[in-house]
Amino acid sequence: MPRVAIVGSFSTGKTTLAEAVAEPLGLPLLPEVAREVASLGFKLDKDATPEVETLIFLRQLYNEMIHDDFVGDRSLIDVMAYAGWVLDNQQRRREFALWDACVKVAEYQLRSQYTHVFYLPIEFPIVPDGLRPLDPDFQKEIDERMVKLLDLHDVKYESLTGSVEERIEELTARVKA
């Protein structure tokens, strides 16, 4: 049962790729949790709080737990990268304990949570969508955190580069292999 996580910074093509491969692979596409949380009125990215990051983490974990197989255009790795940036750039307060508990759960889960992890490096300019930041420096910082987390937690991953069509072909072939 494939559990496919597509990871990378914002505006790297994760959603486009996930939407393109889910149906041909016969796998459910996990909802994009951060956008759901934003629709509830919570602030994301640089303006998020430990409580918001904890909510995103719990929703992502829940979505992954209730599906035996899936394609996700986000993962616990993504959540940890963004939350790490948010919390590293705020003064520590007692609510950080919420996030600390999430990190412990994630560290236990990361290596066994996914059968395939595909990392999308930054290759394209940021596409404005009304929600994502337009800051290439922030995009690069998140990308660096993502790779560091993958390596730190010994998560096996494969990089995908090239056009959307090339990425679709490569991901599909690797999952079906």
What are these regions (language model features)?
Residues 51-112:
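Glycine-rich phosphate-binding loop used to anchor ATP phosphates in small-molecule kinases
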Residues 6:
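Hydrophobic anchor at the beta1->P-loop junction of P-loop NTPases
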Residues 87-165:
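A glycine- and Lys/Arg-enriched "phosphate-lid" helix/loop adjacent to the NTP-binding pocket
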Residues 1-3:
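Pre-Walker A (Motif I) flank of P-loop NTPase domains
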Residues 14:
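Conserved lysine of the Walker
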Residues 19, 23-62:
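Conserved substrate/cofactor phosphate-moiety recognition/catalytic segment
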Residues 9:
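P-loop (Walker A) phosphate-binding loop of NTP-binding proteins
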